[in-house]
Amino acid sequence: MSNKSDSFSTLPLPETSPRGMFRHFGPGLVLMMTGIGTSHLVTAPAAGGRFEFALLWCIPVAYVFKYYGFEMAFRFTNATGRSMLDAYSTAPRKWPVWYVLITTLIQCALGQAGRLAAAAAVLFYVFSEYLGLGLTNWAQGIGIDSLAVYGFGLGAISVAIVLYGRYAAVEMATKVLAGILFVSTVGVYLVEPAPFSAMGRFFTVEVPGGSWLIIAAFLGLLPTGMDVSLQASEWGKAKRVGMGRIREKLEEQGYVRPFDAFSSTKADLSVDVTKLPEHAQEYCRRWFRIGLMDFTLGHIVSFILATIFLLLAAVWLYPSPIEGRAVIGEIARIFTDSVGPGMMVVFIAGAFAATFSTAFNYFDGWPRVVAACCRNLFRSTADLPGIAADQLTPAHRSVMSSEYNIYRITMFYSLVAAVVILAGIPRPVYLVLVSSALAFFIAPVISFLNLYYCLTVIPKTDKAFYPSRFATLFSWLSLVIFTG
């Protein structure tokens, strides 16, 4: 046993100072940025512009009652070293995995069309309205909409970056772009904040006529879609830190049972942390604390931004329908009317940061989930797992059913399908609202499954990872509210 303990004694303990933790942030900030470019930059201004402060209550409802649905995914991955989809594969006939696969393929097309529409709308406004360059006039001459051209260009760039840099590119871009957006938006809000009396609308439920689509979009995509918790679980696993780093060694040394998606039960996912060497326990606990702080910080920042965008739109744009291809120019009035024309550049930088990073992250996230589903459904894919560059062999690249190739194929499918939809429906706000509302109907199932597997896989004696009584009860309450 001492030799086993010695094999874990060299694990580097991560810093837990604020500066040290921030260097390790990633999945939580990525999760936050998957919603900002649409729910914050488009849906929130549409709510404020059309209904003033009436829908402010939707924001705390979404953030408070969806919190543990996301948190359970982080908790499970940190407690077991496996992803939520590995847990889903232990259900009868793997029905949750099939459910996720089908809904994710739909989201790859319709959902990504909404994300690309928002990003394309920024470029359309900059080049066609603000600068008047008309770069896509050639496309209109042959019957192709300008938004589809910009969407294809942005999508192709995103796919190229993700395939070249893998997870590191996603993580680094997210940190930089999130900082640009947060600073510029808060700065503009401080120039002329909303009246204090409007804050009472946080606690007053009101459903104005014609607001149902925006409400569904808010609840579906604030802070982001619940299905993104599965992406975050895969991202967390991809970092290969904490339990995700040592799980394989634990299986080799007999601390935990090996997990096989085609023969194991959910009991084989469980890790009794109390039986691990003390250094390994501390290593896993620290990474869990960092992961929770990463997620919670992203959740709070996302809440602040969503609130500010709605309040700014209510103050500066109401009454306005907030629609059309030039929607970004209309939203830009928040910045130019409040501070001056010079703020246009700041807004464009923030808007592009939000919308592009959202589309960028989804080009990695949804294909990652589809590939993980196939890894848990098909033996040929499970025999060639992994998409990280250091995991790839010639077989990974040559065998079409490998997880890596399914990941790449899904990425290209998402790009083509999203651009086709965008070309057929060149209405950015409408596409954003519909794709966001779709996430609302998926959320309860994913939230339930995340909670169920945390409660039934993580040992109750594990005080560090097992959900507290409050977290459990509040999670059930949240499910009742979102399904009631």
Language model features: what each stretch is:
Residues 97-139, 151, 358-375, 483:
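Hydrophobic transmembrane alpha-helices that form the core helical bundles
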Residues 31, 58-89, 100-114:
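Juxtamembrane transmembrane-helix boundary signature
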Residues 167, 173-176, 386-390, 396-410, ...:
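C-terminal membrane-solvent junction of multi-pass transporters and transport-like membrane proteins
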Residues 139-153, 342, 375-423:
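Loop-to-transmembrane helix boundary motifs in multi-pass membrane proteins
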Residues 1-41, 217, 249, 253-256, ...:
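Membrane-interface "cap" regions at the ends of multi-pass membrane proteins
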Residues 4-10, 44-48, 70-96, 121-136, ...:
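Flexible loop linkers connecting adjacent transmembrane helices
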Residues 179-207, 215-234, 447-461, 484:
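Hydrophobic alpha-helical segments and their helix-loop junctions in multi-pass secondary transporters
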Residues 46-71, 94-97, 303:
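Extracellular loop-to-transmembrane helix junctions
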